[in-house]
Swiss-Prot record:
Listed EC numbers: 1.11.1.24
Function: Thiol-specific peroxidase that catalyzes the reduction of hydrogen peroxide and organic hydroperoxides to water and alcohols, respectively. Plays a role in cell protection against oxidative stress by detoxifying peroxides and as sensor of hydrogen peroxide-mediated signaling events.
Localization: Mitochondrion; Cytoplasm; Peroxisome matrix
Designated name of the protein: Peroxiredoxin-5, mitochondrial
Catalysed reaction, written as an equation: a hydroperoxide + [thioredoxin]-dithiol = an alcohol + [thioredoxin]-disulfide + H2O
Organism phylogeny: Eukaryota, Metazoa, Chordata, Craniata, Vertebrata
Family indicated by similarity: Belongs to the peroxiredoxin family. Prx5 subfamily.
Additional remarks: The active site is a conserved redox-active cysteine residue, the peroxidatic cysteine (C(P)), which makes the nucleophilic attack on the peroxide substrate. The peroxide oxidizes the C(P)-SH to cysteine sulfenic acid (C(P)-SOH), which then reacts with another cysteine residue, the resolving cysteine (C(R)), to form a disulfide bridge. The disulfide is subsequently reduced by an appropriate electron donor to complete the catalytic cycle. In this atypical 2-Cys Prx, C(R) is present in the same subunit to form an intramolecular disulfide. The disulfide is subsequently reduced by thioredoxin.
Subunit structure: Monomer.
Cystine crosslinks: none
Organism: Mesocricetus auratus
Keyword Cytoplasm in annotation: yes
Length: 18
């Protein structure tokens, strides 16, 4: 169940790119 952790990381990066 590390999908959430990975998602968080991606979201952080994507959010920054936004």
């Amino acid at each position: 169940e590390t999908d959430l952790l990975l998602d968080d990381s991606l979201v952080s990066l994507f959010g920054n790119r936004r």
